[in-house]
Amino acid sequence: MLKSKIHRATITDACIDYEGSITIDKNLMQAANLLPYEQVHVVNVNNGTRLETYVIEGPAGSGQICLNGAAARMGMKGDKVIILGYSLITEEDTLTHQPNLVYVDSLNRITKVKNGVASRNLEV
């Protein structure tokens, strides 16, 4: 199940020579309930790529979103990304589970934090 989402963060750097991962501002990690070394999916809004990596903690308040290692080939400074964390939960907990959603501005400052995803009623 979706546990955490940082919506439309801006990549601040891409470091190809680093070992690998995504560096995320500690404040964003805490708001989204992401832990160091936790596996995440990163969806690049600009080019449509989707990658799987793990989180390392960046300085609190820095706004840092940095793709590292091979992941740096999947995005560039200025690209918008959606960062998704998942968790396993019991079937019983699926009835009440709500993910942590973090919305940011162009400098990766938190603008809103909420739980749950709005449903859309699609008429056929």
Swiss-Prot record:
The EC code for this enzyme is 4.1.1.11
Annotated Gene3D superfamilies:
2.40.40.20
Where does the UniProt annotation locate this protein?
Cytoplasm
Q: What class of enzyme is it?
A: lyase
Keywords carried by this UniProt record: Autocatalytic cleavage, Cytoplasm, Decarboxylase, Lyase, Pantothenate biosynthesis, Pyruvate, Schiff base, Zymogen
- Active-site residues are S21, Y54
Names of the cofactor(s): pyruvate
User: Sorted alphabetically, which CDD domains does this protein's record hold?
Assistant: Asp_decarbox (cd06919)
Q: What does this protein do?
A: Catalyzes the pyruvoyl-dependent decarboxylation of aspartate to produce beta-alanine.
Q: Kindly provide the name given to this protein in its UniProt entry.
A: Aspartate 1-decarboxylase
Q: What is the lineage of its organism?
A: Bacteria, Bacillati, Chloroflexota, Dehalococcoidia, Dehalococcoidales
